[in-house]
Amino acid sequence: MSFTVTQYILFLFSFFAVGGAMSLAAYRDDRTASFVGSVFAGLGSLAGLCAGIAAIVAPQATTYSIATMFPFLTLSIHIDKLAGIFLTIISLVAFLATVYGYGYMRHYFGKYNIGAFYFFYNLFLGSMMLVTLANHALFFLVAWELMSLASYFLVVFDHKEH
């Protein structure tokens, strides 16, 4: 079965959205939240890797747009060969960080909200990939701000003094 670049992109954002929501919903059980958040972050990263490689070998660029009720905000993504290269690099690093982070987060079990961490982690990965794909200036800025806010919450996650 062969998928198009657009289908890989839809899988990518679906995995990150579901992973973030499910890990946040499982916030009371650290093991479940960590497992679900990591699995969906890994699947989203693999979908991004497939989308990036498919875009690199595709003969032409792909554009996908969704109309909104705001005339100045078009949800439009565009993936050409350059975006495919960046998406491939980001996805590969994200996948490796997810695999490493799954074991690393065990020592935070019972100390912090692991579900919230994986919510922001999935949001960060999805918005970082969205920055490379945004085809509209305002949409790019929204994705950039989502990425910035998610990274802030990831940085302050370990906020207790040791």
Please describe what each predicted stretch is.
Residues 1-8, 21-119:
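Transmembrane helix-loop-helix hairpins at membrane boundaries of multipass inner-membrane proteins
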Residues 13, 77-78, 91, 133, ...:
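Short conserved micro-motifs on helix faces and helix-strand junctions that flank
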Residues 15-19, 44-47, 90-100, 122-125, ...:
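Membrane-embedded alpha-helical core segments of multi-pass
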Residues 31, 116-162:
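Alpha-helical multi-pass transmembrane bundles of energy-transducing inner-membrane proteins
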